[in-house]
């Protein structure tokens, strides 16, 4: 069984793969920008967790990630703390493509799980520095959840959302089933897919019973789009790195250098991080430099 931080780094690398894969195929400009924006923040989190893992456990995160994801700084974690209303984006609507709806559902669920893990597990980590790093980044993950949930269609009914939720789960298990090479795990994906298809049928029945809508009014083409495939994201992420100096202002993105001194971003930063010298994400890198002479 992997220790918590090693398990976390494996999961963190996988989620960054998912985000990059979703962004690379997304056609909605607003959704694509949101994915790119949070992707660079998550890469910086991985960078800092990886240094903590090496410093405290003697494990190189690169060995856990299989070479698919490059461990490097992204948008500095300290600069990711934003005033709450700067994490809300313009939503999609019913006219969005099925692939866009799937992408929004997938990334919202992934970020929600990450936030829950950080918030629930941080208190049990073995060192004070690790607990503080979890706590700091949990705040950022909560912001990411707000961003991605705000992309959802606010006019969709609960049963329409239930149908899309079950459809999304079917799509993910189907994608895992197609890519899996381990027979035992492939059979598990197949079993879960069959279960979720049953849930999908039930959601369609509820939609028809209580809202008089056929599932095709929500999902016009019941066939899955191209399955989600995970692979190397190194070159793709390098192409996004040019936006590390961007932050959010209301529903839009802007360079930090273009913000006036009175901007909510700076007021919030001064409140949350009044002294950069005590910010956990900074302390991890400082400790790593002292121990190994490189970040």
Where in this protein do the model-derived segments appear?
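Non-heme di-metal
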Residues: 1-295
